[in-house]
C-alpha cells in the first residue's frame, strides 16, 4: 500500500533474494505472481494451500469449480432420466425389475452441494450516454507549484480517440495535482487544458472524504443527488440498481454514508461514475481499499469501456491490462 511502481519493483526484488520464509497479504495480483511460491486460500469456511503463484491458484480454483458444476449437471441429468423411467414403468410387471434396478442406481447418485463462497464480485460497467467527437483533450505547457514545490513543469500531451492513458511517476502529489486540474477541480499556474465540446467527464478522486464527511444521507439518497439535472427524483429501484451492482442490497442501501468503510466508499464512488454515463473517465488510484474481487471487476470494467480513460494506479497488472499509453511525470 502507498508504494509507487518503482518501490514495488524494489520490494519484489528484495523478497525474491530473501533466503528466509515470507508470509504476505496483498491485493496486488502481479506482486503475488512474482513473489509467491504458494497460495493459501481462505474460502468456503476452509483453508487450502496451492503450490504455485496467484495466477496458478486462480486458474486451479476456477477449474475445480467448473468441474464440480459439470459433474453436478451430469448427475442431475442422470437422476432426471432414472426418475422418469421409474415413474413410467414401476407399475409395469414386465419392466418392474428394470425399474427396481434403476431405483438402486438412483439411490447411489449424489449431487455435490457447492458451499457458499465468501468471495463476491461486483459488476463494474461504464456505459456512455453519447460518443465523444474527434477533438478530445489538449494539454499545453501545464505547470503547477504548491507550497513552493514545483509539481508540474511544462506538461503537454493530447488525448486521442480510444486512448486509455496511465499516469505514473515517483511523486504522488504531482500526479494527483495533474488529475485535479484535468477534472476541473484545480487551476494550473501556467498552461491550458482544452476539452472537446463533445466530451463528458467523470472524476474519481484519490481522497473522497469531502463526499462523505458530515453527510447523514442514506446510500440511496446519496447516489440519487448525482442523477442528471431534472432527474433528482429518479425512482428508487433505478438508483438501487447501480448500488446493487456494487454489492449494496437489501437494507444496506439505507445505511448512512458517513459510517461506510474505505472499500464501501470506493464502491459508492464507482456507482456514481457509472450513473453519470460519461465518455471520459478520470481515476486517481481507483483500487485503493478494494479487495481482489473488486479490483478485478474494476479492471475488467475499464478494459471493456468504449470511451477514454485517464488513470493513476500502483497496480502493475491494472496498468498493463488497461493502458495503451503511459505518461511518466518526472
For each predicted feature, which ranges?
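ABC ATP-binding cassette signature C-motif
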Residues: 1-70, 129-330
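Flexible nucleotide-interacting loop at or near the entrance of a catalytic core
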Residues: 63-152
Amino acid at each position: 500500500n502507498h508504494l509507487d511502481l518503482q518501490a514495488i519493483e524494489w520490494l519484489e526484488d528484495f523478497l525474491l533474494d530473501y533466503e528466509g520464509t515470507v508470509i504476505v497479504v496483498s491485493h496486488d495480483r502481479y506482486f503475488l505472481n512474482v513473489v509467491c511460491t504458494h497460495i493459501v486460500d481462505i474460502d468456503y469456511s476452509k483453508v487450502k494451500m496451492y503450490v504455485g503463484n496467484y495466477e496458478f491458484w486462480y486458474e486451479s480454483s476456477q477449474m475445480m469449480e467448473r468441474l464440480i458444476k459439470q459433474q453436478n449437471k451430469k448427475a442431475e441429468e442422470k437422476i432426471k432420466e432414472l426418475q422418469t423411467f421409474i415413474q413410467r414403468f414401476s407399475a409395469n410387471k414386465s419392466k418392474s425389475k428394470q425399474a427396481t434396478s434403476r431405483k438402486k442406481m438412483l439411490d447411489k447418485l449424489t449431487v455435490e452441494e457447492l458451499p457458499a463462497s465468501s468471495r463476491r464480485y461486483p459488476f463494474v460497467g461504464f456505459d456512455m450516454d453519447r460518443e465523444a467527437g474527434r477533438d478530445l483533450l489538449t494539454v499545453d505547457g501545464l505547470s503547477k507549484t504548491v507550497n513552493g514545490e514545483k509539481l508540474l513543469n511544462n506538461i503537454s500531451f493530447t488525448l486521442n480517440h480510444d486512448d486509455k492513458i496511465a499516469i505514473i511517476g515517483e511523486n504522488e502529489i504531482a500526479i494527483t495535482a495533474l488529475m485535479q486540474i484535468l477534472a476541473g477541480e484545480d487551476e494550473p499556474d501556467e498552461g491550458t487544458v482544452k476539452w472537446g465540446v463533445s466530451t463528458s467527464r467523470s472524476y474519481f478522486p484519490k481522497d473522497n472524504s469531502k463526499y462523505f464527511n458530515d453527510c447523514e444521507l442514506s446510500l440511496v439518497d446519496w447516489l440519487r443527488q448525482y442523477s442528471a439535472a431534472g432527474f433528482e427524483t429518479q425512482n428508487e429501484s433505478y438508483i438501487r440498481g447501480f448500488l446493487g451492482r456494487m454489492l449494496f442490497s437489501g437494507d444496506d442501501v439505507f445505511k448512512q454514508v458517513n459510517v461506510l468503510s474505505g472499500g464501501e466508499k470506493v464502491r459508492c464512488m464507482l456507482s456514481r461514475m457509472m450513473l453519470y454515463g460519461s465518455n471520459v473517465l478520470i481515476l486517481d488510484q481507483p483500487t485503493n481499499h478494494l479487495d481482489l474481487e473488486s479490483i478485478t471487476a474494476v479492471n475488467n470494467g475499464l478494459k471493456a469501456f468504449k470511451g477514454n480513460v485517464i488513470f493513476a494506479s500502483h497496480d502493475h497488472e491494472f496498468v498493463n491490462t488497461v493502458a495503451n499509453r503511459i505518461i511518466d511525470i518526472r
